[in-house]
């Protein structure tokens, strides 16, 4: 595709969390190579090139679908993440891993094989494995780096003090240092602001943030009296699935719905959707900073939804009253907001 200049304030990364073979991941909405190609067409039409995938996405099938869609031939840059699933209730998400050295090596090699590439630009440790000394993990990661299997290291879902520990260990041992931190962050989940963000700024670590729409909660699709039978099987808040229960635990409560009602009312006054309120806040009114190398991840369930998100991210700052309502809304849910780390 030809070179197109993005119109967004921040680099936008396409999250591949909804890509997968339906037989392997109940929540997959982008299930064929043709579906993936259509999603990538929409993404690249806005000038964006980075895609974020993980070993657990689609139980490994997200990577293979991206490979089949010829991500390299399209000029994309795909990053991959390794989640330590083995000691968690995540057996349904494919091959199990820890962050023990042998598993880190096996995990990265599995990433490369699935993506059909000899090297990753960015390899991310998706969460801590606190049963493995972090020094052991980082030592093996550095060996993999020195072997030329990836160019940059990222970390995600670690506590702020763990970030300090990791950065200092890497400095002390002359190991490859993390180049960015990936986190959950949105207008109604700002748990990273008091401690993690200052930590990242102190180490000049860019912040890449996901779940800008609260896992889809900040859309027109949901209401508090919505019966379970109305949820599409496998959808983000389907109470019958693992990931549905996970999102419901985080967002599906009266405090969040009270705030959602207020956002909708104020949005109508300015002809703004929930999506526009959430994404324009993140782009213009949050603690993200372009000069710090920060970026925003979006995860479209289909090309039309992705297009809506990308257009919202190209829009200007919100009216002052809307920002005030969003800030007041967060103050009301702050007491029930979960941690930013795993």
Swiss-Prot record:
One GO molecular-function entry: oxidoreductase activity
Enzyme class: oxidoreductase
Residues that carry a glycan: 271
Gene3D superfamilies to which the protein is assigned, alphabetical: NADP-dependent oxidoreductase domain
InterPro entries for this protein: AKR_Detox_Biosynth (IPR050523), NADP_OxRdtase_dom (IPR023210), NADP_OxRdtase_dom_sf (IPR036812)
Up-regulation conditions: Expression is positively regulated by the azaphilone pigments (MonAzPs) gene cluster-specific transcription regulator pigB.
Signal sequence bounds: 1-27
Protein name: Aldo-keto reductase pigE
Species of the source: Monascus ruber (Mold)
UniProt gene name: pigE
């Amino acid at each position: 595709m030809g070179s197109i200049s993005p119109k967004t304030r921040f680099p936008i990364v396409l999250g591949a969390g909804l890509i997968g073979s339906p037989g392997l991941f109940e929540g997959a909405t982008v299930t064929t190579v043709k579906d993936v190609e259509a999603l990538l067409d929409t993404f690249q039409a806005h000038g964006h090139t980075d895609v974020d995938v993980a070993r657990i996405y689609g139980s490994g099938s997200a990577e293979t679908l991206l490979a089949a869609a010829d991500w390299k031939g399209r000029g994309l840059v795909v990053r991959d993440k390794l989640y330590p699933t083995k000691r968690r209730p995540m057996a349904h998400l494919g091959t199990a891993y820890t962050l023990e050295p042998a598993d880190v090596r096996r995990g990265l090699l599995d990433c490369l094989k699935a993506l059909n590439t000899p090297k990753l630009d960015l390899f991310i440790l998706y969460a801590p494995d606190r049963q493995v000394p972090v020094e052991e993990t980082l030592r093996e990661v550095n060996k993999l780096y020195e072997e030329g299997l990836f160019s940059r290291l990222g970390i995600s879902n670690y506590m702020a003090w763990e970030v300090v520990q990791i950065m200092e260990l890497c400095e002390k041992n002359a190991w490859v240092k993390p180049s960015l931190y990936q986190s959950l962050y949105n207008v109604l989940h700002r748990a990273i602001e008091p401690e993690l963000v200052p930590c990242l700024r102190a180490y000049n670590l860019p912040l890449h943030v996901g779940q800008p729409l609260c896992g889809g909660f900040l859309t027109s699709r949901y209401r508090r009296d919505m019966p379970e039978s109305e949820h599409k099987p496998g959808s983000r808040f389907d109470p019958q699935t693992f990931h549905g229960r996970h999102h419901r635990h985080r967002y599906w409560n009266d405090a969040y719905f009270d705030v959602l009602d207020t956002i909708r009312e104020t949005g109508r006054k300015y002809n703004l959707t929930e999506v526009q309120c959430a994404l324009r806040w993140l782009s213009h009114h949050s603690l993200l900073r372009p000069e710090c190398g920060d970026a925003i991840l979006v995860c479209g369930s289909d090309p039309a939804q992705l297009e809506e998100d990308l257009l919202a991210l190209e829009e200007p700052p919100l009216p002052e009253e809307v920002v005030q309502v969003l800030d007041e809304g967060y103050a009301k849910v702050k007491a029930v907001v979960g941690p930013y780390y795993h």
